[in-house]
Every structure is written in structure tokens, then in C-alpha cells.
């Protein structure tokens, strides 16, 4: 015979019983109150059943009965209880342990109330930790000078794409990652060495080392890791020549150029060499550096530095002077403008050389000529205005000099923005006009078999 136990919970008392066929009451039921609102039926352990009824048989598949909320009225004997249970109870699988003999349901874990203030403080602490990690990561990214690093990387990639020799995806990926890391390492060392000087310039006051987000020692450690990994990737994934160029660029920019910035105006020419090395790295990844096309690309990047930087430094020349940087913009303003124009004009023969040495087609001269002319126009206006400003007629007239200087500032800004767009335009056009780039469009029409 199957035996199940029934526990009825009331506001006054309780009763234990066995239901189904041969129902037998184990405990007293007379104390059940009429206002019972909840009935819970549980299977009791074998020991509990035997304590009250030695002949009872333990049910190995216990069932939990959960009552509805309807009240039980007029319960007076065993039969009444049995009938009421049949009418009001439904059966569900027991989710409790079959050895349970507790009369009250319980949770298998301790419930501890959490104070609202403590919870808010914990949430604030977690958010603060997350914010600190984010700020630290942003600071290290800023150490690499992301915009400058991207420009360096793109110049290497464009040079690699213009190489007449076949390229591979693996080699391109290693070149991209390695060049990016080497550039980031050089910039991090530069920032680590100049916090006292950068603090005096509005343009550089927000750098991470200046505001204390990263210490100089941390910047140097970061640069060492980036530089080591970058040169290793270039050495193993590309070739030793590219790795040597990457390492030399780190030393040239972070030590020689950075030191010369406070000693002599020649630092600008040294810095231009730094910009010319990435195209050589891209070319050397797939082709020998004996090809004259590689030096045309390097010369293009070298010449571009002067109209770009000289016009930029012109408008912040006083900041450079106050910070102790020796720049042509304030040491010799007329020379600064003349050099910007001179190297803008040099773009024409360098672009011509790309077509002459079969790197691009001859149509490239039309496109690049328009872009070069646009840059030269603003560089020329900048130079002519500065030449007028420092003439004997204007230089000694304070009012006219200030008016002329304001005009020169406008031309310098326009020349600077022209240079920002000039370099990507010239490189992209070179890729589009690469020699034999579009021959596949005419292959079918030139094939006599298909005519």
C-alpha cells in the first residue's frame, strides 16, 4: 500500500496525517482552525513515519500537495479532512529532500539583508575601478600619439603597395603591426623625456605624462616593450632590413631629434628624416632599396614635413619660444616661410620621378600636379606675406607689421590644412595610378583570339 503524509499548516495548530487509501491520522487534527489559508503536504522521512505508525510503508516517490487559498470550514474528523483534501489539493512533484522532517519550508542558503548604502558604495567602487582601468588604457594609447602613428603606418603601407614586386598578406600584417609599435615606442619615449617642457605649451598640456596619468618611468617601460615587440615582429615577419630601419627610427626620433629641439633649428631637418624612413620600410619589405622609386617616395615624405610643420609652428611660435624649443618659426620667421615654399615646389619633380621610374603611369602627373599646385599656392602666399612683413618698409611700422602678421597667420593655417589633405591625396592617387594597375580592363579587347 502506498503511504503519503500530509501536513496542514494553520494559524493555530497543525495536524499530521497519511492520505490516499487507508488514510490514518498521525497527529491531532482537532486544533485545526477554520481560517486556514495555506495547506502544504510534504513526504516525511522514514523515521518520522515509523515513529507514529510502525506498519506504514515509505513512499519512494514523494509528492508535494500545494493547496489553493480557499478556506477549510467545518473540519471535524478524519473523513472530512480526507474529502476536503481531495477537493482542494492538487499534486506536484516534491522538490524537497525525501529525508526532510521539518514542518516549515526553508531555503538551502542563508539570506542576509544588504544595507542600501553598502550596496550603493559597492556599486560606486566597481564603477570607479572600471573607470580607472579605462583611463589608464586611454593614457597609454595617448602615449603613442595615435594620429601621428596612423600616418606613419599608412605611409609604410602605401609604399609597400606601390612596390612592383609581389606582396603577401602575412608580410603586410607584420609590417603594419611592427611599424605601428615602433612608431608608438618612439612617441612614448619622446613624451617621457619632455613633460616639463610640454607643460608650458597649451598644445601639449593634456599629454598623459604632463597630467600625471603615466609617470616617465612607466612611459619608458611601455616604450621598451612596444619597441622590442615591434622590431621583433619586423625581423621575424618581414626581414632584417625593415627591422633595422624601424629600430633606427626609434633612436632618431626619441633621442636625437628630441634632444636637438632645445639646441638648434636643424632639429626640423632631422625630424623630416624620421618621416622619410617609414616609406623605405614599406618598400624594403618587398623590394630592394636600390630601386630609385623607393627614394622618390622617401623624398616625398621628407619634403612634405616642411610645409606641414613650418606652417603649424608659425601659429604657435610663441609657445615654442616660452617652452625653450629652438624653432625656425621664431628664430628666423622669413626662413621658416621660405623653406615651406621651397619644399612644396619640390613635390613636382618627386611626383614626376614616380612616373619616370615606372612606379605610376603618366596620368598621375595630371592628378598629382593639381594637388601639388594647391599646396604651393598657400605656401607661396604665406611666404610672400612674410617677405613683405619683414621688409624694411613694414618691419619698423608696428601697426602695419601686426596687420601683415595677422594675414600671414591666416595663410599659414590654410597652408597647414592643405598639407594635411595633400599627403593622403598624393599617396592614394599614386596607388590608383600604379603602373599596369588597370591593364586588366583592356586585356579582352587587345586579345586577338577574342576578336
UniProtKB/Swiss-Prot annotation:
One of its GO terms (biological process) is heme A biosynthetic process. Its EC number is 2.5.1.-. GO terms for cellular component: mitochondrial membrane. Keywords: Heme biosynthesis, Membrane, Mitochondrion, Transferase, Transit peptide, Transmembrane, Transmembrane helix. The chain crosses the membrane at residues 149-169, 240-260, 265-285, 289-309, 339-359, 414-434. The keyword Phosphoprotein does not apply. Gene3D superfamilies: UbiA prenyltransferase. It is a multi-pass membrane protein. InterPro entries: Protohaem_IX_farnesylTrfase, Protohaem_IX_farnesylTrfase_mt, UbiA_prenyltransferase, UbiA_prenylTrfase_CS, UbiA_sf. One of its GO terms (molecular function) is protoheme IX farnesyltransferase activity. It is found in: Mitochondrion membrane. The keyword Transferase applies. PANTHER family: PROTOHEME IX FARNESYLTRANSFERASE, MITOCHONDRIAL. Belongs to the UbiA prenyltransferase family. Converts protoheme IX and farnesyl diphosphate to heme O. This is Protoheme IX farnesyltransferase, mitochondrial.
Amino acid at each position: 500500500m502506498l503511504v503519503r503524509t500530509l501536513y496542514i499548516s494553520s494559524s493555530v495548530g497543525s495536524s499530521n496525517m497519511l492520505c490516499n487509501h487507508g488514510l490514518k491520522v498521525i497527529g491531532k487534527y482537532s486544533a485545526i482552525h477554520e481560517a486556514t489559508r495555506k495547506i502544504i503536504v510534504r513526504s516525511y522521512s522514514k523515521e518520522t513515519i515509523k515513529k507514529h505508525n510502525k506498519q506504514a510503508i515509505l513512499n519512494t516517490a514523494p509528492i508535494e500537495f500545494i493547496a489553493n487559498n480557499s478556506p477549510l470550514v467545518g473540519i471535524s474528523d478524519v473523513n472530512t479532512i480526507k474529502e476536503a483534501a481531495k477537493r482542494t489539493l492538487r499534486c506536484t512533484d516534491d522538490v524537497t529532500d525525501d529525508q526532510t522532517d521539518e514542518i516549515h519550508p526553508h531555503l538551502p542558503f542563508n539570506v542576509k539583508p544588504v544595507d542600501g548604502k553598502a550596496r550603493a558604495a559597492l556599486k560606486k567602487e566597481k564603477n570607479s575601478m572600471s573607470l580607472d582601468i579605462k583611463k589608464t588604457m586611454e593614457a597609454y594609447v595617448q602615449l603613442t600619439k595615435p594620429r601621428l602613428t596612423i600616418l606613419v603606418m599608412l605611409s609604410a603601407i602605401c609604399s609597400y603597395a606601390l612596390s612592383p614586386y609581389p606582396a603577401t598578406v602575412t608580410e603586410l600584417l607584420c609590417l603594419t603591426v611592427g611599424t605601428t609599435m615602433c612608431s608608438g615606442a618612439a612617441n612614448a619615449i619622446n613624451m617621457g623625456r619632455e613633460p616639463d617642457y610640454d607643460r608650458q605649451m597649451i598644445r601639449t598640456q593634456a599629454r598623459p605624462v604632463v597630467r600625471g596619468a603615466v609617470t616617465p618611468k612607466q612611459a619608458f617601460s611601455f616604450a621598451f616593450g612596444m619597441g622590442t615587440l615591434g622590431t621583433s615582429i619586423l625581423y621575424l615577419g618581414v626581414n632584417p632590413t625593415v627591422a633595422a630601419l624601424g629600430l633606427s627610427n626609434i633612436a632618431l626620433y626619441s633621442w636625437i631629434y628630441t634632444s636637438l629641439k632645445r639646441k638648434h633649428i636643424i632639429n626640423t631637418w632631422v625630424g623630416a628624416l624620421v618621416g622619410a624612413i617609414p616609406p623605405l620600410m614599406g618598400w624594403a619589405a618587398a623590394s630592394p632599396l636600390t630601386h630609385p622609386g623607393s627614394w622618390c617616395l622617401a623624398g616625398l615624405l621628407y619634403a612634405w614635413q616642411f610645409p606641414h610643420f613650418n606652417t603649424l609652428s608659425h601659429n604657435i611660435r610663441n609657445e615654442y619660444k616660452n617652452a625653450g624649443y629652438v624653432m625656425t618659426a621664431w628664430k628666423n620667421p622669413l626662413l621658416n616661410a621660405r623653406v615651406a615654399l621651397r619644399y612644396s615646389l619640390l613635390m613636382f619633380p618627386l611626383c614626376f620621378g614616380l612616373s619616370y621610374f615606372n612606379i605610376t603611369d603618366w596620368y598621375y602627373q595630371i592628378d598629382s600636379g593639381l594637388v601639388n599646385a594647391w599646396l604651393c599656392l598657400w605656401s607661396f602666399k604665406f611666404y610672400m606675406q612674410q617677405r613683405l612683413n619683414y621688409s624694411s618698409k613694414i618691419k619698423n611700422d608696428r601697426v602695419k607689421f601686426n596687420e601683415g602678421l595677422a594675414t600671414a597667420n591666416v595663410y599659414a593655417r590654410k597652408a597647414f590644412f592643405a598639407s594635411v589633405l595633400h599627403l593622403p591625396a598624393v599617396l592614394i592617387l599614386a596607388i590608383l595610378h600604379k603602373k599596369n594597375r588597370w591593364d586588366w580592363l583592356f586585356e579582352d579587347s587587345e586579345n586577338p583570339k577574342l576578336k
